[in-house]
Amino acid sequence: MLRSVKESFSTNRVHLGMDEAAQLGLGKYLRENGYTKSSVLIREHSARVFEICKKLGLEPMIWSDMYITANTGGGYYDLADDTDCSDWEKPDPDLGLVYWDYYNPEQKIYEKMIRVHQQLSNKVIFAGGSWIWNGISPNYSKTFTCTRAGLAACKKYHLPEVFCTAWMDNGAETPVDAVLPGLVLFAHLGFHEDFDEKALAEEFHDVTGASLNDFLELDALDSLFQNGQPNLDTDNPSKYLLYQDPLLGIFDRHIEDLDLDTERYYQDLADRLEICRKHTPAYDTLFAFYHSLASTLAGKADLGVRLKKAYDAHDLSTLETICEEVIPGIINDLSTTRLLREHLWMQDAKPFGYELVDIKLSGVIARLTSTRYRLRYYIDGRVKRLEELEADRLPYFLPGTPKRENLWHRIISGADLMDTI
């Protein structure tokens, strides 16, 4: 594999990964070899791979979390300010150690983590991120808060190298161009001692030809519960309110409890994004996609709430309107959204993987169509009740916890599609 990498790229630097192996040495290795501390195993394994890299003339780096969690037995960030690493298992001094953090809003946490890393290695690298992995929509408030805190700490402790990650969890649903504000922020902070909002906006326009403020409007797609505050909890309602089944209403309780007017919220956002689209012809399809998504959510987000309310009240007139007018309108909007997402994918990437996005979006259309059939049967008296709408709507999220669910298979049904064996 490493020979193939060396032949495929001009750089001699390679990232070996090796992160989040939380049960290292506690499975098959334990059964066959007996117990060895995880910290010893990660050191021995990384040393072996490092020797291969040296023979090939490659300069490797790895994620750092296993050198922390395997030594402490705790979480990656769960370290005391005065942590002493003198008796820890440590990597080879020439192996780059990458501290990844795009979660913490406070600079002091980054400073603590950097101090620990500098005890472990002389080649510490920082990896932050531009949040495009949280569902369908980017989270710029989280990106900006964490990046500013993280890079300020890197400057204070004179880290020579940083990079920006852009993960694609659960199917790369967010279009790749949404990464741009986070990337430009990284560059901006690399050339400015302090954050300068006006200079950043000018630099963003210089390198993209677009308005930063227009891009930042996309943050509102997942800020439904934030009341104007930054979405630091990484709530992602634009994903689960789109994908959830209208008859099951798994997330409806959270709309009801807060008495949110989701139709007005998302329609106002759609109107703003239509204006943004006119400002940014170079990113017309991106803004057309998010305009269409917001329009879809204006109809879809509280559909289950309206269905349940009308059903419980035996309001056949409202159910008739939902069946014959509301749902067809949502299907029409979502069909446009799906086609725009396909266009963006084929413009940005190879086709492989789009089938997953297509299945997800098309699945919503299929379930909306099935919902119409079920309603029609009930309205016409061919069935006496709809068992899906008989069930009480229960909270999905515990009180005081983030309203975030990024796994599609958990959103679409209470019956888990994943194999439990």
Predicted feature descriptions by range:
Residues 3, 7, 11-14, 20, ...:
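Substrate-binding groove of N-acetylhexosamine-processing glycoside hydrolases
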